[in-house]
UniProtKB/Swiss-Prot annotation:
Name listed for the protein in its UniProt record: Ribosomal RNA small subunit methyltransferase A
UniProt family annotation: Belongs to the class I-like SAM-binding methyltransferase superfamily. rRNA adenine N(6)-methyltransferase family. RsmA subfamily.
Species: Listeria monocytogenes serotype 4b (strain CLIP80459)
Subcellular location: Cytoplasm
Binding positions (S-adenosyl-L-methionine): N29, L31, G56, E77, D102, N128
């Protein structure tokens, strides 16, 4: 079997063989350090009793490592130019299926049912995500309720900081809440920019998301809950009142009544959104939802 893909020499050899040119628009940066790949699969807790979905396999470096440790791997690749390369680099493995397509447009549950020989095995999602589509992909996987026990992503460190943030920090925001509402988030380790080809401008990080048995807080309307959280961070330096009144103008004539009601449940509208934890946002959105329905 050929040596691991994730080395500078082997990666360069593959790229030259196929005359492959990186597409900046697809955020293509290939990992050239196999030690990082081992740490990713260890973080994801992949075993031979695990099915894995990978997004953006590139030339197959992470895919190869996943295939060594998982039962079966299904990889989504959007760039048609990479399909013959993957056929070549992964030819030694019989437990990999490469699906040509955009995961953002795919029916992932249908792919799971059709592509995995044993679709009922525990599922994990692992990916080196392109920076430009990181947030849309993660939110799609959450909102489509893909039955994955965990998701392990390598992504831009700044985004990993936002996903794993705690209240009253500059990284904490609506993205934090959108993900931590459903998942426990752990920033596992930092990945220096020097282990990629081509080298990106910033460092990356690996984040591990583990599905909660129940959402972190009870809300009456999830869609409205996320609408309230996004509004609360619309302008970070503004108070809850200023942001919410801008989003929901019907609140303005009833400010005194609203202040009194929220004070009764421990929420002061002079606070900023970044100071509220997820259970407090749940109380806020539940109260606001009922309040706005009143005549």
């Amino acid at each position: 079997m050929s040596k691991d893909i994730a080395t500078p020499g082997r990666t360069t050899e593959i790229l030259k063989k196929y005359g492959f040119l990186f597409k900046k628009s697809l955020g293509q940066n290939f990992l050239i350090d196999s030690n990082i790949l081992t740490r990713i699969t260890d973080t994801a807790e992949i075993t031979k009793e695990t099915n894995v979905i990978e997004i953006g396999p590139g030339i197959g470096a992470l895919t190869e490592q996943l295939a060594k440790t998982a039962n079966e791997v299904v990889a989504f690749e959007i760039d048609q130019r990479l399909l013959p390369i993957l056929d070549d680099t992964l030819s030694a493995y019989n437990n990999i299926q490469v699906v040509h397509g955009d995961v953002l447009k795919a029916d992932v549950e249908e792919v799971i049912a059709e592509q995995f020989a044993k679709p009922d095995l525990p599922l994990k999602i692992v990916a080196n995500l392109p920076y430009y589509v990181t947030t849309p992909i993660i939110l799609k996987l959450l909102h489509d309720n893909i039955p994955a026990d965990s998701m392990t992503f390598m992504l831009q460190k700044e985004v990993a900081d936002r996903i794993s943030a705690v209240p009253s920090t500059k990284s904490y925001g609506s993205l934090t809440i959108a993900i931590q509402f459903y998942m426990e988030a752990e920033l596992a380790f930092i990945v220096p920019k020097t282990v990629f080809m081509p080298q990106p401008n910033v460092d990356s990080a690996v984040i591990h998301l583990k599905r909660r048995k129940e959402p972190l807080a009870e809300v009456n309307d999830e869609e409205f809950f996320f609408e309230v959280t996004r509004a609360s961070f619309a302008q970070r330096r503004k108070t809850l009142w200023n942001n919410l009144a801008s989003k929901f103008p019907a609140l303005k004539p009833r400010k005194d009544e609203l202040v009194e009601g929220l004070n009764a449940i421990g929420i002061d509208l002079i606070r900023r959104g970044e100071t509220l934890d997820i259970p407090e946002f749940a109380k806020l959105s539940n109260f606001l939802g009922d309040f706005l329905k009143e005549k």
